Amino acid sequence: MHPKTDHIEKIITENFRYIRDIKKIEAINHNDINSKNFLIYSKKSKYVLKFLKNNQQKRNKQIQRILYRANQNGIKVSIPIKNESKRKILDDVILSKFYNGKTFSGSVQELESFGYELAKLHKFLKKSKVKLQKDKNIGSYKLLSPKDITRIKKIIGQSSNPNKIDNMVKRRLEFLQQINQRHSEFQKKRKKFDEQLIHNDLHTDNIIFFKKNISVILDFYFMKRGTILEDVSYSALRLSEQTSKNFKNIEKMVNLFINTYSKYNKIHQNELLNLNYFLSKNSLARINHILRNRYFHDSNSWVQQLPLHFKLLDFSYKIKLEV
């Protein structure tokens, strides 16, 4: 075993002693900046070891209990493997089974399978009485104020060496201010929507298929209370964008997935009437988070995803709901 992975093998041998004969440990390349993941090869199976970076032990334990109960209710989620140690380190170190499979390929069968499984998940989460501790970073995803936009513009203007990210942000600031303002006004006057626990991070890497059917839904550590349409619309947009660059095809697939999901779990009409708001909500939050980090906290976390989320934000206000 390589010296760099010796400490990982030690964690496993001390806390998961029933996993024998570790053959190899590899770092997993992924988009989740909130954890560091490793693929563990043993003689009989493969596992994923996740080191959470959020320092929210209570929240992590709450989510793990939710996942255990979901699994017991037949929901296809990845559950932490119970350890044999009471050591504090295990509060933020999660071992789970590795699932073979592929990301979305664009088939109707995959959409049907995921729509059914997501509806089951939402029905289960709706019954949960857990008062989930809020993500401590949630504030960085809030709407940007006109003062924030002005501050970002000033920082870019004063830069002696702006790069292509800065130039892209500068070009989109007026549009971004309009969308943030639109969301702010909507949130002040909107009717109250039904909220429950939702996944809140259903991008393509967290939805795994095997033989065109859902194998597992991964990574629930961004969970929050929200509307089911937030999950449905964001996952529809991410799945659609992965398989086509043509707007009409993306619009068609988003509508197809909403209709597929609705066969198994009703989406309230007042939410559907505001589809563009929900379609744009997640990408706007992520853009705002990235810009706050970059310009206010000197951090480039997730900055590589900025072009994607600007593109999704553009799509969000062009897509029309088919009736």
Locations of regions flagged by a protein language model:
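Active-site activation/catalytic loop segments of kinase-like enzymes and analogous catalytic loops
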Residues: L229-K266, S280-D298
